[in-house]
């Protein structure tokens, strides 16, 4: 049986159940997504954008899916902390695909809010008009604003173009919604902890390996400013498969800083698609940090729809054992006078594999485009493998574009120099690897997060970091 057939059968048999636990805005596009998924099937490695990751194999196992929206009786605020020292954030949790929010650790869902115990680290009040809530709550309460906002759902993430997006859209029942009104600046960063958990600690029965479908919709109106930090973690030693689709609309003169940090278990599979649309004179800073994982596949599609927009896209990957990390980016310059900059760095040890495929598309008429793409990689062993494919596709004649990639080992001369001065070989390698990765870390705008990442990266290279350093479950 083809790996996609089980998901086709699942939707056919459980469509009414899926729809009964989701708002109409999400249900309205579900059947179309199903038809697109059935038509496409999972992409093979012959498909250009998926050539480095075997998607069909990842989705072949029989995972359980929580379509009944059964709550796992766990208070994430009590069992899990992911604090960044000196970084003041508004803290939210997504446990599998259920959104926890508010001063009392409330659980958001289609039935409203389930209140929990008041917690000492309550989430501070957001600026007037700012919404951070579950999609189900927002779209289940009709108003002129929600009617306006519902038009953004599943518009960037086209199900006809990507089978993973189609699968997520047909199965997802809730998600996180973030809205910032015109000219509102959110000074305090929004921190979202994506926590995968299959069963409470006192469960007596065996729980199947779990598939989770997460969704995020971000809308920034003209002149709005927002910083968001996503931290992905696993709380159970089980196999998880997580699909994630993020849509972000960045209005004219708006600014979005987006950080995605992964510290998951080696049994975790994460497939994430991020779609960003930028209007005139907007700014986006997109950062992907993979410190610990099993198999990770990140896709970024960013489009310039208005002149004068800028984006900086940074990524750093540290992988060992048999971990696999695949980053695929497409930046489309549709209009003139836009600037894009990409820098991705990998350090691969043991039998880890990495892949970076980046493409910059400059369409007809997109004159005065400026674009720079760089991918640099270190392989610490002969068994480690890195695949790199930077690409430019240009249909305008007045542009400034460059791209390049390197794959190599640590500099022997530098190692020899440090050994001559009494530094051990292991410490010398650590210093060089840190210096290599720190070029990416130093470009991140949030200073407390930057300092924290320097600390976590060093611990990762020393082999002392297996899960989130702030997780109470790991103590």
Protein language model regions, located:
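N-terminal amphipathic, basic helical "cap/leader" segment at the start of enzyme domains
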Residues: 1-166, 343, 349
């Amino acid at each position: 049986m083809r790996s996609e057939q089980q998901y086709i059968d699942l939707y056919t048999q459980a469509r009414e159940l899926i729809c009964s636990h989701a708002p109409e805005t999400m249900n309205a596009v579900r059947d179309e997504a199903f038809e697109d998924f059935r038509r496409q099937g999972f992409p093979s490695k012959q498909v250009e954008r998926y050539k480095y990751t075997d998607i069909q194999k990842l989705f072949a196992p029989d995972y359980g899916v929580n379509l009944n929206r059964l709550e796992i009786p766990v208070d994430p605020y009590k069992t899990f902390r992911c604090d960044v020292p000196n970084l003041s954030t508004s803290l939210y949790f997504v446990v599998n695909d259920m959104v926890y929010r508010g001063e009392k650790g409330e659980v958001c869902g289609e039935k409203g809010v389930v209140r929990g115990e008041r917690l000492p680290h309550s989430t501070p009040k957001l600026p007037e008009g700012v919404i951070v809530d579950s999609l189900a709550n927002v779209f289940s309460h009709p108003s002129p604003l929600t009617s306006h906002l519902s038009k953004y759902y599943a518009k960037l993430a086209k199900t006809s173009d990507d089978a993973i997006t189609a699968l997520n859209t047909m199965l997802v029942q809730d998600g996180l919604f973030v809205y910032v009104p015109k000219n509102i600046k959110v000074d305090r960063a929004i921190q979202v902890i994506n926590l995968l958990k299959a069963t409470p600690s006192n469960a007596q029965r065996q729980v199947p390996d779990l598939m989770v479908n997460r969704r995020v919709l971000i809308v920034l109106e003209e002149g709005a400013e927002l910083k968001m930090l996503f931290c992905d973690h696993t709380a159970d030693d089980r196999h998880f498969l997580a699909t994630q689709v993020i849509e972000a609309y960045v209005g004219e003169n708006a600014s979005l800083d987006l950080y995605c940090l992964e510290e998951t278990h080696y049994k975790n599979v994460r497939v994430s698609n991020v779609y960003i649309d930028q209007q005139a004179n907007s700014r986006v800073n997109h950062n992907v940090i993979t410190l610990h994982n099993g198999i990770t596949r990140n896709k970024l599609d960013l489009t310039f729809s208005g002149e004068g927009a800028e984006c900086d896209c940074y990524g750093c990957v540290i992988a060992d054992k048999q971990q696999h990390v695949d980053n695929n980016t497409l930046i489309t310059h549709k209009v003139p006078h836009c600037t894009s900059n990409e820098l991705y760095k990998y350090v691969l040890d043991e039998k880890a594999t990495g892949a970076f495929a980046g493409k910059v598309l400059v369409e007809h008429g997109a004159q005065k485009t400026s674009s720079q793409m760089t991918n640099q990689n270190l392989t610490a062993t002969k068994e480690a493998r890195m695949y790199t494919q930077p690409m430019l596709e240009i249909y305008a004649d007045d542009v400034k574009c460059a791209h390049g990639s390197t794959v190599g080992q640590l500099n022997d001369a530098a190692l020899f120099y440090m050994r001559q001065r009494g530094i051990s070989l292991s410490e010398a390698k650590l210093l060089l690897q840190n210096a290599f990765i720190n070029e990416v870390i130093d470009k991140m705008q949030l200073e407390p997060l930057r300092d924290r990442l320097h600390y976590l990266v060093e611990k990762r290279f020393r082999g002392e970091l297996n899960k989130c350093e702030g997780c109470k479950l790991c103590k």
